[in-house]
UniProtKB/Swiss-Prot annotation:
It is an enzyme of class 2 (transferase). It catalyses: N-(5-phospho-beta-D-ribosyl)anthranilate + diphosphate = 5-phospho-alpha-D-ribose 1-diphosphate + anthranilate. This is Anthranilate phosphoribosyltransferase. It comes from Pasteurella multocida (strain Pm70). Mg(2+) 2 binds at residues 225-226. Anthranilate 1 binds at residues 81, 112. SUPFAM superfamilies: Nucleoside phosphorylase/phosphoribosyltransferase catalytic domain, Nucleoside phosphorylase/phosphoribosyltransferase N-terminal domain. Belongs to the anthranilate phosphoribosyltransferase family. One of its GO terms (molecular function) is magnesium ion binding. Keywords: Amino-acid biosynthesis, Aromatic amino acid biosynthesis, Glycosyltransferase, Magnesium, Metal-binding, Transferase, Tryptophan biosynthesis. Anthranilate 2 binds at residue 167. 5-phospho-alpha-D-ribose 1-diphosphate binds at residues 81, 84-85, 89, 91-94, 109-117, 121. The keyword Secreted does not apply.
Amino acid sequence: MQTEQLLHQLFEKKALNQQQTEFLFTAIVRGQLDNSQLSAALIALKLRGETPEEISGAVTALQADAESFPIPDYPFADIVGTGGDGANTINISTASAIVAASYGLKVAKHGNRSVSSQTGASDLLTALGVNVHISAHKARQALDEIGLCFLFAPQYHLGFQHAIPVRQALKTRTIFNILGPLINPAKPKRQLLGVYSSDLIQPYAETVARLGHEHSVVVHGSGLDEIALHGVTEVAEIKAGQIERYTLTPQDFGFQPQPLETLRGGKPSENAQILTALLQGKGKLAHQQAVAMNSAMLMSLFGYPNLKQNAQAIMDIIATGKPFETLQQLTQY
């Protein structure tokens, strides 16, 4: 009965509070809504625009339903985007996670198969010989030992399967597209979060603040769900519940802008070749710089605030080829 009341509230264009949304999404991941109810709920949320309270409630429900991951007591982060920006670039956040781990940061990367591009994080890692289906225990071991693990979303969020038919039928973005980066089963309190639209920056930032992150950043880079090498990046930085908005350019990292065309990716096999060259220090300069900018911002969440110094440190470590060794180590788990 309560589910029907909540659906009625949505149809009246009234927002749900966090607790109500948590109840509704718990019902969704348990398969308690039929496809027509679920479809109607997702469309009602989309047309009105999801509030931070609603996004937070959905995240809480999905995290409670997720398979557990042994959360470490040391600082670690995630770098992840919503996808869906339609730009079909190389996998910048996946490369940045590997490079940042090579620098000595701890990164629990949450990811999935491709949404709208040709190559999602798991597609790429599989092409590189990484087993994305390892157990939570094994993944934690990798995080402890080499500073990097990959958590494959469908393995932890089994309840998502109930929404797949409706999402495929709707063929449009729904709240599920924006939940992915926020439901890492390791529950990192430091995240570099990329969003596909600048309209999402503020609600995302407010959601992150509600969820109690220690230090996270939400970015949208001139059409990309990453920090942009080709233009201006809009930023919301969340620290201790406070949100600060500002913009960044490539010059803030010590680089000159490069055309977006230089970052175009392709199929998993093509992106794997591009990433291998990059991690070996043999990649295109634009690829290295794009990864350095995103890794530099990730470093700032660990107490390294100087973005130019960070970017240079990352360029130096890429030149050594050490990130490729980190990738090789990851394939052993």
